[in-house]
Regions:
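Membrane-spanning alpha-helical segments of multipass transporters and channels
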Residues: 1-276
Length: 276
């Protein structure tokens, strides 16, 4: 889980790099702009360019990460993982970076806002602290509002959902069954409720119990379910579209503010100076 979490966290410095490049091009565009293009051309072109570069980099990262890890080389799951990580996640963090940039008065404040919101999304996405241990206030507010919650859930379940779990010898828990009972009879109800498996269900001395029998049990225990995959995919698109709307609305408001507060020329003084 933390490997996937760290792969997602790589976007933090990339967000600031995107903001720096886009701010430079925005300043250049505004100095040289002759009203030949609609005002929305600048932010939309920045998104297209940055997303294309991000997808190329994410594809290389995906090839190095996914197949060398060899957790799940199923072609369908590999395609799902690529779609969520190399396409959707790149769309999200690029539009997030540019949206926060246009929402902020300058690049320095944009860096502060981006870092603050990023910290909230990361801390309460279920990786640093499991869902069951998150305080109720944060569980039902920031947890469900964090985009990382849905990216992490999809990528975790895509890798582990259909994989069996085989415990090493030092990973089994040792239990003593009640007198006259086999391990299978003693642990039957608990395994039915919590999952896991016994190394030998017929023994009556020591029960060797593994906490999980499948990757699905592991992800379900973290409040992550593969059945939510396409629902989460739709939520990802909602975040991306929301970022684009924020970006365009913020830039338009900035242009309106500048036009209303633009200093007016003194026509009278100009006329007098020309006559003289």
């Amino acid at each position: 889980m933390f490997a996937i979490f760290l792969v997602l966290c790589v976007c933090s410095p990339l967000i600031h790099q995107v903001q720096n490049r886009c701010n430079s091009s925005k300043l250049l565009y505004e100095m040289r702009e002759f009203r030949l293009y609609h005002w929305s051309v600048l932010p939309l072109c920045q998104v297209v360019l940055e997303v294309a570069i991000a997808i190329i980099g994410a594809t290389l990262s995906y090839l190095c990460f996914f197949f060398t890890w060899s957790v799940n080389n199923n072609s369908t799951r590999a395609g799902y993982f690529y779609l969520d990580y190399a396409i959707m996640f790149q769309l999200y963090y690029v539009t997030y970076a540019i949206g926060v940039l246009y929402f902020s008065p300058n690049e320095l404040i944009a860096d502060v806002y981006a870092s603050l919101f990023f910290a909230l999304m990361v801390v309460f996405c279920g990786a640093m602290q499991p869902f069951s241990m998150i305080p109720a206030f944060w569980k039902y507010t920031v947890y469900y509002e964090s985009p990382f919650t849905y990216f992490l859930e999809n990528m975790m379940t895509e890798l582990f959902d259909d994989r069996p779990v085989i415990c090493d010898s030092d990973e089994f828990a040792l239990l003593m069954p009640q007198d006259g009972m086999t391990c299978g009879a003693y642990m039957k109800d608990y395994i039915k409720m919590k999952g896991g498996y016994l190394k030998s269900s017929a023994t009556t001395i020591y029960c060797t119990y593994c906490t999980y029998a499948s990757g699905q049990e592991f992800t379900n225990n973290l409040h992550m379910y593969f059945k939510n995959h396409w629902r989460n995919f739709g939520i990802m698109w909602a975040f991306v579209v929301g970022n684009v709307i924020l970006m365009l609305a913020a830039y338009k408001c900035m242009l309106l503010f500048r036009s209303r507060h633009k200093p007016k020329k003194d026509v009278t003084s100009e006329t007098v100076s020309e006559s003289v």
